[in-house]
Every structure is written in C-alpha cells, then in structure tokens.
Amino acid sequence: MNHLYRSFKTIALVGKPRNDINLQMHKNLFHWLMERGYQVLVEKEVAITLELPFEHLATLEEIGHRAQLAIVIGGDGNMLGRARVLAKYDIPLIGINRGNLGFLTDIDPKNAYSQLEACLERGEFFVEERFLLEAKIERASEIVSTSNAVNEAVIHPAKIAHMIDFHVYINDKFAFSQRSDGLIVSTPTGSTAYSLSAGGPILTPNLNAIALVPMFPHTLTSRPLVVDGDSKISIRFAEHNTSQLEVGCDSQITLPFTPDDVVHIQKSEHKLRLLHLKIIIITMC
C-alpha cells in the first residue's frame, strides 16, 4: 500500500477530448469523484464545454498549485502536453488511455472506475519518476526561449527535407560534426517514440542516459550515441545553413532559431511523477 493516496484531497481531470465519448468520460468521472467526497478541478476548456460550475474550472497552472493528483484522460499526446506543464509543480499524474498506444497512460477505460478505486481508496499503486529535457536557445549570450520535453527535442530545418550542418559539444567538449536532416535528442521515455523510428536505441525508463540520434545523415558511418543523463549538450550551426531552423519539443512546442544561435539541451530540474497500477501476479508451482 502506498500511503500517498491519503493526501489526495483535490483531484484534477485534464486532457483534450477528441470526441464525444472522451468528453462524456470527463463528465462521468467528475461526478464519480464528487460522489466520493473529493474536491475536483477540471481543465478550463473542458469544464466550460461541460458547463460545470465555475468553482471547478482551472488552468493547468492553477491545477498545479491546488491539486494533489491529476488524472489525464486521453492518449500519450495528452499526457505529454500536460506533463510538461505540471512537472514543475511536483504533482503526480495517472492516465486513462483513450488514445492508441498508451505507453504513458496505464488505466484501461473499460475498467477505469475499479482501477481508480484501487488507487485512490486502497493505495494500490507505485510512483515512478522520469526526467525531462530542457531545451534553450542562446542568442548573443542571452537565453531567448526555452521549453521542456518529456520524449525528445528535435533539431531540424523549418523547411521540409533540407539538410543542415552542425557541430555537437558535450560538456563543452567537441563531440562530432554532422550533415543531416536534423538531430533527435531523446530521453529514455522518448526512446520508444520518434527516436525509435529513426533507428535509435531502446532505453529502459530508469536509465540515466540521453540518446542522440541522427536523422538521415549524409554519411555511412554516423550512428546513434548514448551519453550520461547529466550531460550538457550544445549544438552550433554553420553559417551557410538555411536561416529558418527549429527545435521541436515532443512535436508540440516549437522554438525557432537561426544559424547564429546556439541550442543547449540538458536534463530539466523538474521530473515527471507517474502513478502506475500495482499488478499482482499469481504463479502456479
């Protein structure tokens, strides 16, 4: 039993419903939690759509300050978007999978209420921490933009299918130069996402490691590189590159930059705290 469940007084429902079925689940779960005596906050846009009383509306930032648990209803994309914001508030998240793969969303919607009851009323869960990446754009010795990423930060040209030349430094030491369509810098969580499709290695979630995976490199010898998770990665660009470059964080946030800028990527100070169901396995002897 995890005694953390006793601290769950205010629970938030977050996620962006893609259809009426998902929207109805928000509504049903809202009433289910209210009937059990919890204070319930609902992400603002969803709460307005459901015409819930004003006191239950909250932005993600307000949820971070007020809730002790966030339930994400949707697929991994919903989890990624909410995790980037809520991680800095140290609030744990648990997901009900209404998407496709559900790598980060544990709960089966068909058994959602019984599984949530086990978590919320009997503490049958464990907490897993996963680190995020922080991407920063340096321009004329000043940081002009920044974003977190749960899965990966991808350096690429804004123009589709256009090669770029860049130099990678690890802990301020030159590592390699490359000419390719871009570079994927991935966490262990993201190693089974975009990084995997580019030939990157699969890393177990508890590894303290970062993978650097080239995207269509113009060479026969370029291979993915795995470095220590506490490494500080800097990428500098040749002047002749296209003037429009981007860092994409989890394919949801975009940081534009130019070849004169420097991209810095390292482990974020914030962590994603995921609640997972405890699975009891009975073996026959």
Curated annotation (Swiss-Prot):
Which species does the entry assign this protein to? Haemophilus influenzae (strain ATCC 51907 / DSM 11121 / KW20 / Rd)
Write the Enzyme Commission number(s) for this entry. 2.7.1.23
- Gene3D superfamilies for the chain: Probable inorganic polyphosphate/atp-NAD kinase, domain 1, Probable inorganic polyphosphate/atp-NAD kinase, domain 2
Q: Which reaction does it catalyse?
A: NAD(+) + ATP = ADP + NADP(+) + H(+)
GO BP terms: namely: NAD metabolic process; NADP biosynthetic process
Per the Swiss-Prot or TrEMBL record, the active site comprises: 76
Residues bound to NAD(+) are 76-77, 151-152, 162, 179, 181, 192-197, 252
Q: Which domain of life is it from?
A: Bacteria
Give the protein's recorded name.
NAD kinase
**Described purpose of this protein according to its UniProt entry:** Involved in the regulation of the intracellular balance of NAD and NADP, and is a key enzyme in the biosynthesis of NADP. Catalyzes specifically the phosphorylation on 2'-hydroxyl of the adenosine moiety of NAD to yield NADP.
What the entry lists under InterPro entries is as follows: ATP-NAD_kinase_N, ATP-NAD_kinase_PpnK-typ_C, NAD/diacylglycerol_kinase_sf, NADK
Keywords of the record: ATP-binding, Cytoplasm, Kinase, NAD, NADP, Nucleotide-binding, Transferase
